[in-house]
Amino acid sequence: MPLKSFFFSAFLVLCLSKFTQGVGTTEKEESLSPLELNILQNKFASYYANDTITVKGITIGGWLVTEPYITPSLYRNATSLAKQQNSSSNISIVDEFTLCKTLGYNTSLTLLDNHFKTWITEDDFEQIKTNGFNLVRIPIGYWAWKQNTDKNLYIDNITFNDPYVSDGLQLKYLNNALEWAQKYELNVWLDLHGAPGSQNGFDNSGERILYGDLGWLRLNNTKELTLAIWRDMFQTFLNKGDKSPVVGIQIVNEPLGGKIDVSDITEMYYEAFDLLKKNQNSSDNTTFVIHDGFQGIGHWNLELNPTYQNVSHHYFNLTGANYSSQDILVDHHHYEVFTDAQLAETQFARIENIINYGDSIHKELSFHPAVVGEWSGAITDCATWLNGVGVGARYDGSYYNTTLFTTNDKPVGTCISQNSLADWTQDYRDRVRQFIEAQLATYSSKTTGWIFWNWKTEDAVEWDYLKLKEANLFPSPFDNYTYFKADGSIEEKFSSSLSAQAFPRTTSSVLSSTTTSRKSKNAAISNKLTTSQLLPIKNMSLTWKASVCALAITIAALCASL
């Protein structure tokens, strides 16, 4: 076939496939076409030869910073204890801040100490090593540095009023974790997951703030206390050589650019890096980790980069500092479940998003190393309390019945992933496995590494490595793919199971009675408009689709005649 004719035919097939997409019922599932399969195969093959991965990590979230959806029993117990103390029906425990405030010092201390003692033990670290991970990310809150709860006195005699319980409790268990990591030859990445006043309003920062202003860098002493904690972290964990497993320090997790001015976040990053350099010996190679602040990939390329001093000097004079751009690692977090548009995507689109995301990160690597420091197996937001205690799921529409946020989108379907694995359909299992494999194959080939969220939960299976592995939904070893080959290309059998329609969309608003409360991982940014919302292609009329397709065919015919 002449080359021009081939391209014309391929273009026509593609146009017709797009023309028919969305016409008729949305409940019919369509398998990948050979063209779509070839697109994905080519995308994976393009970068797979560049084996850049150094990090194969796991996070032990929900431990030293508690999270309701990871251990809901802890929060149910806290509510029960509060009711015993006070018969008021007004009890609302939604995060660690309100847990400590409601229960008071003694009860909170007993409850949390037992949780720290039992949720993560030495056995977990041994299993993490056995399962093939080489790094453990340990989230910890700023309140671990509280030295006198009665006086709200922190390190460096800084006073900051909050109800958190500490007096060295979290740091004691952190030291245990470092000893276990050293014993089992695991690297550790320390992560300041909660900053004073909350840096994002998510419950995993310690304090859930769904609608109000954030306190970090706004309230008195939040900046001073943050700097004091960073200084202590650097003085404590740098320059230890082989005596310490700490290889990276993430100065703050997920500062929410937009609700916090990005220039303020950037300035804090520079001040933190200056503190690190002042406390770091020339032989120390501990990595300075920054989160992307929810800015686009590539945003931080020129920052903290000695090649671009004209950029850096606006915030800090680092001319005399001896450092390389490779000393600063950018941490990206990626989930596909915290907007309506993501939840409504087809499985093909979801996996293509992952491939494109990896491609974009790969282009960053010449500026700074970059990892996907949080990702999961979740393809819905249905896990109990994922969006917050008392908050529902976007997937079944209950999110909008339990918050002040609104949407024009219909629910995608009925939640099932919050149920026991035994109640999952085989189709749902297949999709979760495919999604996990796509991320492993992409992040292993196109980034500096990955860190899965999370090691374990009580019942949020899509976020639970141990449960996913046990159900054969997470490859073990990590490259033991079902849908991909060792070179990263896609198995042919993927074409029969990877559907072009993620899930049948319900025609009515079917709500699950079991999904009335979820965790607000990204509740504060859930209403940002996505591309599909700004350009609703799927909602085009049939006449408009036909017009567009006719125009495309005309252009293709002209090209073929040249």
Swiss-Prot record:
Family assignment?
Belongs to the glycosyl hydrolase 5 (cellulase A) family.
Q: Which residues are glycosylated?
A: 50, 77, 86, 90, 106, 157, 220, 281, 285, 310, 317, 322, 401, 480, 539
Q: How does it sit in the membrane?
A: Lipid-anchor; GPI-anchor
* Statement: the UniProt record of this protein carries the keyword Cell wall biogenesis/degradation: yes
For this UniProt record, the keywords arranged alphabetically read as follows: Cell membrane, Cell wall biogenesis/degradation, Glycoprotein, Glycosidase, GPI-anchor, Hydrolase, Lipoprotein, Membrane, Signal
Protein name per UniProt: Glucan 1,3-beta-glucosidase 2
UniProt keyword annotation of Secreted present = no
Q: Which reaction does it catalyse?
A: Successive hydrolysis of beta-D-glucose units from the non-reducing ends of (1->3)-beta-D-glucans, releasing alpha-glucose
Please list which residues make up the signal peptide.
Answer: 1-22
Family annotation (SUPFAM superfamilies): (Trans)glycosidases
**Gene Ontology MF, one:** glucan exo-1,3-beta-glucosidase activity
Which segments cross the bilayer?
none
Additional comment: Present with 2410 molecules/cell in log phase SD medium.
The protein's location, in the record's own words, is:
Cell membrane
Q: Name one GO biological process term.
A: fungal-type cell wall organization
Record-annotated active site: E254, H334
- One term under GO cellular component: fungal-type cell wall
Q: Which InterPro entries match?
A: Glyco_hydro_5, Glyco_hydro_5_CS, Glycoside_hydrolase_SF, Glycosyl_hydrolase_5
Q: Which species?
A: Saccharomyces cerevisiae (strain ATCC 204508 / S288c) (Baker's yeast)
The record's top EC class is hydrolase
- EC number annotated for this UniProt entry: 3.2.1.58
**Pfam families, from UniProt?**
Cellulase (PF00150)
